[in-house]
């Protein structure tokens, strides 16, 4: 079963994090591990740290997941963008971590209508 959401890669020695988003978090984490182990990760700061501290000093965690049933792909991506930005701020992973951007890079603009839908979907 696919999990859509936000994940964190944490260096347990330095407490630095990388925050990411995915429509399939488990597969995305698997691909991060594969590329890091091969020394071919697209994020040079994360790769360098991984080589220095070793695989045993990195923890992978799903921070946030949500039910995508009934949502359009645009709504899903907008929601992921918003949550990714929130988590990057929360864990300070742009200024003091491995994120190379401030997040929300799925190239979708969060419309007011989408913001209302997302807000309503999270009310009890």
What are these regions (language model features)?
Residues 119-124:
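Short, intrinsically disordered, charge-balanced linker/junction segments flanking boundaries
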């Amino acid at each position: 079963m696919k999990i859509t959401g936000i994940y964190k890669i944490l260096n347990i020695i330095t407490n630095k994090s990388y925050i990411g988003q995915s429509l399939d978090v488990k597969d995305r984490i698997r691909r991060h591990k594969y590329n890091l182990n091969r020394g071919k990760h697209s994020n040079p700061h994360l790769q360098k740290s991984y080589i220095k501290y070793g695989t045993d000093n990195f923890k992978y965690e799903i921070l946030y997941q949500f039910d995508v049933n009934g949502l359009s792909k645009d709504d899903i991506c907008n929601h992921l963008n918003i949550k990714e930005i929130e988590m990057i701020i929360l864990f300070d992973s742009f200024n003091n971590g491995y994120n190379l951007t401030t997040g929300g890079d799925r190239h979708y603009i969060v419309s007011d209508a989408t913001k209302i839908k997302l807000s309503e979907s999270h009310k009890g």
